[in-house]
Amino acid sequence: LDAVDRIVGGLEKKTKVMTDEEKRSIAIHEAGHATISWFCRYANPLVKVTIVPRGQALGAAWYIPEERVITTKEEELDQICSLLGGRAAEELFVGAISTGAMNDLERSTKAAFGMVAYTGMSEKLPNICYYNNDEYSFQRPYSETTAKIIDDEVLRIVNDQYKRAKQILTEHKDGHAELAQLLFDKEVIYREDVEKILGKRPWTSRSEELIKENERLEAEKKAKEDADAPKLEDMPDEVKQAQAEHEKAIADKTRDNNLDKDSKDQSTENTKK
């Protein structure tokens, strides 16, 4: 994970000085992301949370991005809710919001805009795509009236998920507080730490389902190979004899090697004396 951290997040800035108040605020923010993603079924699985500054970030939560062939509306909403978990935690448990959520707000707004303008997931503009592949065009492919509807729908989606994030954090405020304190003390926590505090997730992630399915297929493949492999008792006598001689030769060679090693060790010991 250290190599991935350096590539994705940049080098650690251990010399960056923070007050305990700033450090606690960042811990509460990152614990907010971790808590929301833990209780949102379709949020990417959590791997690690840190409040050690890297690059431009003062803290970060690392997830396993799930490579989905398609993405449902529920999955998009869970990701937006998870992104807003840090800002929601600041409002609820710090009592003041900060600029630390800027990247989260940018990503959640872009995701909501994509749902409304590109993938037809809006209640007021269903099944409509306003995507314009002319990157040099200064004209939007919709009217001012539609632009107002898009703005309103983006705002509604973000606000709804922000309220949802605050509700989840309120329901699990004790777990969040314990998580934030552990993060404040240790600076880095992992999935196992989150599971000890918040309990096992009531569902498996898509990544976990794919891993289990792959393990099942591998087990079936091995069982079939074992079943198709010729058994010793079914082999001709000459093959059985050759197999036995081969195994005996390996055993003899191993024994001789061990004897040579013991002899050399004894000779070395006598020389020292």
What is each stretch, according to the model?
Residues 1-3:
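C-terminal helical "lid" of AAA+/P-loop NTPase domains
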Residues 5, 9-20:
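P-loop NTPase nucleotide-binding/switch module
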Residues 20-28, 34-273:
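Soluble catalytic regions of large protease machineries
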